[in-house]
């Protein structure tokens, strides 16, 4: 199963402040919406609660709480490992979409990392881990918006 991480991160590594994304960059989320359409997303519960359920996606939500879902598109798991075991039988590709603890747990297992680097230093308390050695940047495109950003793809190997 291919594992892709996808995140928007400030120049100083921030991805969140509490449950919020501490910026709004016009157009930046369109790529996320397009790439994750009809895909499985692996997220933590706080991220799922803050983003809400987007249409035409399936969610594997990792939580310490014992939650049962009646929605066939939302499945809860007690650990990242149990989510991966389930997803390995359900799909050939997942998008890991946060939060900080989930990224940290899976960054070394990722095959591809999709980053939108927001060209601003932002205050926050949730961070994206450094891209590990062994990843190589394979694509970069800059965008002008209300806050400029650069979309990057990093691939293992």
Curated annotation (Swiss-Prot):
One of its GO terms (molecular function) is dihydrofolate reductase activity. Pfam families: DHFR_1. The keyword Transcription does not apply. Keywords: Antibiotic resistance, Methotrexate resistance, NADP, One-carbon metabolism, Oxidoreductase, Plasmid, Trimethoprim resistance. The keyword Heme does not apply. Residues 2-156 form the DHFR domain. One of its GO terms (biological process) is folic acid metabolic process. One of its GO terms (cellular component) is cytosol. InterPro entries: DHFR (IPR012259), DHFR-like_dom_sf (IPR024072), DHFR_CS (IPR017925), DHFR_dom (IPR001796). It catalyses: (6S)-5,6,7,8-tetrahydrofolate + NADP(+) = 7,8-dihydrofolate + NADPH + H(+). Its EC number is 1.5.1.3. Pathway: Cofactor biosynthesis; tetrahydrofolate biosynthesis; 5,6,7,8-tetrahydrofolate from 7,8-dihydrofolate: step 1/1. It is an enzyme of class 1 (oxidoreductase). Belongs to the dihydrofolate reductase family. Key enzyme in folate metabolism. Catalyzes an essential reaction for de novo glycine and purine synthesis, and for DNA precursor synthesis. Homodimer. This is Dihydrofolate reductase type 6. The lineage of its organism: Bacteria, Pseudomonadati, Pseudomonadota, Gammaproteobacteria, Enterobacterales.
